[in-house]
A protein has these predicted regions:
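Active-site and donor-binding regions of nucleotide-sugar-utilizing enzymes
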Residues: 1-139, 154-162
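Active-site donor-nucleotide binding/catalytic segment of nucleotide-sugar enzymes
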Residues: 137-179
């Protein structure tokens, strides 16, 4: 988004934390960033606040914005309330007006909690399927024969997550029987 002209109030790396061990030492700083962000939104008086993913940060900002203004709130990427902590949807509905969901089955969960919700699709799911020619080219490029098993390791996007989980993924890969 910065590449498209958005000015960020701070580096997003400040929020790329996982687990209590990373969050606790920075708790006060994170609380300050939430307050600063909410105050900036309230001062700007936008027609709508659109928050994107990062529910632990964004939903706290939205709560403060709703408490201090009449700004409509839209959240892109529904939290996985269908998988765990279902009560989050009802809490979220107190300060989120509309949700843009990645998956069609999320819409009823959000609506049942009291939010408007539209299924907008997942960027990866929108990709066209691989063609047989592309699959053959991939097999040839990497020396795979037809029917060869292939393991894909997707460690995540946060540096701390990759650093922490990388060795575990490596051990898992080493133990995998791909024969």
């Amino acid at each position: 988004m910065q590449g498209q002209g958005m000015d960020s109030m701070f580096a997003m790396e400040e929020l790329s934390l996982m687990g209590i061990a990373e969050i606790l030492p920075k708790y006060r700083h994170l609380k300050r960033r939430i307050r600063e962000t909410a105050d900036a939104v309230i001062a700007a008086k936008p027609d709508v606040l659109i928050t994107i993913d990062s529910p632990d940060f964004c939903l706290r900002v939205a709560r403060l914005v709703k408490a201090g203004s009449n700004v409509r709130t839209v959240h892109y990427v529904a939290p996985t309330v269908w998988a765990w902590r279902a009560g989050r949807a009802e809490k979220m509905a107190r300060h989120i007006d509309h949700v843009l969901a990645l998956f069609p089955f999320e819409t009823p969960f959000m609506q049942a909690a009291g939010m408007d919700c539209d299924f907008v699709g997942h960027p990866v799911a929108a990709e066209p399927p691989v063609t047989p020619d592309e699959l053959r080219a991939f097999d040839e490029k990497y020396g795979l024969g037809r029917g060869t098993e292939c393991m894909v390791i997707l460690p995540g996007s946060r540096r701390s997550e990759v650093e922490r989980m990388g060795p575990i993924f490596g051990q898992t890969f080493a133990q995998a029987d791909l024969g």
